[in-house]
């Protein structure tokens, strides 16, 4: 059954399905920070408090952990894996209160997500043959191989994520173009 859900109801539906299914694997992709996961963008929020996650409804609804192993794969969520010395972070809540035994999440902003989605692809496509860590590692090796095929000197560039975020993107682009012979 293909049914359209109003964006204001997506978080409600997610919480309902989370409780109903008690999943072994959770995969998310939406805007996130160290302090929240928006589902969808700008509307519904999951937030951490006291090492647990709650749905930020009019009356906050805390989510329960699980009694079985759980993997949380934040394949397309910026910053959600960044603990930043804060026990009130999303990563701490997923690993403690939500009982994720493994978690993959970005500690930088991302708009492409090859590391997350590629790692998930390697893990799922090789189900039972690779550990989660091996799948992520092989994906990273594949990304390096691809960069080397595009232009070997790409591997010599330092990708300064924090500087790019703080308005120094032009400096990075100039360095990148110089190294790859585009300037």
Over which residues does each language-model region extend?
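Catalytic-core segments of thiol-dependent peptidases
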Residues: 1-88
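Active-site-proximal C-terminal subdomain of hydrolase catalytic domains
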Residues: 71, 75-183
């Amino acid at each position: 059954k293909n049914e359209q859900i109003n964006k204001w109801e997506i978080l409600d539906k997610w919480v309902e399905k989370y409780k109903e299914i008690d999943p072994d694997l959770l995969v998310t992709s939406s805007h996130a920070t160290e302090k929240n996961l928006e589902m969808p963008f700008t509307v519904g929020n999951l937030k951490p408090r006291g090492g647990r996650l709650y749905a930020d409804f009019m009356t906050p609804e805390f989510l329960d952990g699980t009694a079985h192993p759980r993997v949380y794969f934040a394949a397309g969520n910026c910053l959600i894996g960044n603990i930043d010395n804060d026990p009130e972070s999303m990563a701490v809540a997923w690993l403690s209160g939500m009982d994720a035994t493994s978690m993959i999440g970005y500690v930088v902003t991302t708009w492409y997500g090859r590391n997350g989605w590629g790692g998930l692809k390697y893990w799922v496509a090789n189900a039972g043959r690779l550990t989660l860590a091996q799948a992520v590692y092989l994906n990273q090796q594949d990304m390096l191989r691809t960069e080397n095929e595009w232009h070997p000197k790409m591997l010599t560039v330092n990708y300064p994520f924090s500087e790019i975020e703080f308005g120094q993107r032009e400096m990075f682009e100039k360095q990148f173009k110089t190294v790859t012979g585009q300037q």
